[in-house]
């Protein structure tokens, strides 16, 4: 068995990204039949891995601000993705509420010194 190697993981940025201020007013959106069925499938979180041949400083000062700006602008058209799901007591139905004070998505950026190709390989 191969010797275990300690690898470091460091959070380099955590922020909430919302649509540009004042661009989307408070909006309630009713759920469709399909939306209601999906409520019981569980919470979805996405994780993306990228190998970047640039220094961390370049990434945090150049690339990351552009990624956040792009995500913010995409929320102009897809603001329910930055909204909250509210489930009032019966007989009321669940709905999505976008509120400028609470509408955002959490973005966490992490770097690691682990071997990228080894981490992404299928070891099954």
Region roles according to the model:
Residues 1-124:
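Non-catalytic N-terminal regions of enzymes
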């Amino acid at each position: 068995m191969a010797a275990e190697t300690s690898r470091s993981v460091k959070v380099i940025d955590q922020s909430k990204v919302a649509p540009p201020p004042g661009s989307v007013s408070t909006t309630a959106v009713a759920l469709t039949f399909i939306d209601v069925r999906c409520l019981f499938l569980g919470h979805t979180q996405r994780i993306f891995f990228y190998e970047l041949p640039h220094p961390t400083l370049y990434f945090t000062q150049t690339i990351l601000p552009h990624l956040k700006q792009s995500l913010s602008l995409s929320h102009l058209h897809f603001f329910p993705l930055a909204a909250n799901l509210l489930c009032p007591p019966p007989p009321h139905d669940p709905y999505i509420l976008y509120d400028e004070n609470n509408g955002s998505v959490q973005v966490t950026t992490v770097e690691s010194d682990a071997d990228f190709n080894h981490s992404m390989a299928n070891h099954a």
